[in-house]
Amino acid sequence: FWGTLAKLALKAVPAVMGMIKKE
């Protein structure tokens, strides 16, 4: 469970950072 959660987090973080930089 935590392994999957970690993978999702690693994919989500760059996406969120990208959205913040665009704003």
UniProtKB/Swiss-Prot annotation:
Compartment(s) of residence: Secreted; Target cell membrane
GO BP of this protein: defense response to other organism
One Gene Ontology CC term in the entry: extracellular region
Keyword Secreted carried by entry: yes
Pfam families xrefs: Antimicrobial_4
InterPro entries associated with the record: Antimicrobial_4
Annotated family: Belongs to the non-disulfide-bridged peptide (NDBP) superfamily. Medium-length antimicrobial peptide (group 3) family. Ponericin-W subfamily.
Name this protein carries in UniProt: U1-poneritoxin-Da3b
Biological source species: Dinoponera australis (Giant neotropical hunting ant)
Lineage: Eukaryota, Metazoa, Ecdysozoa, Arthropoda, Hexapoda
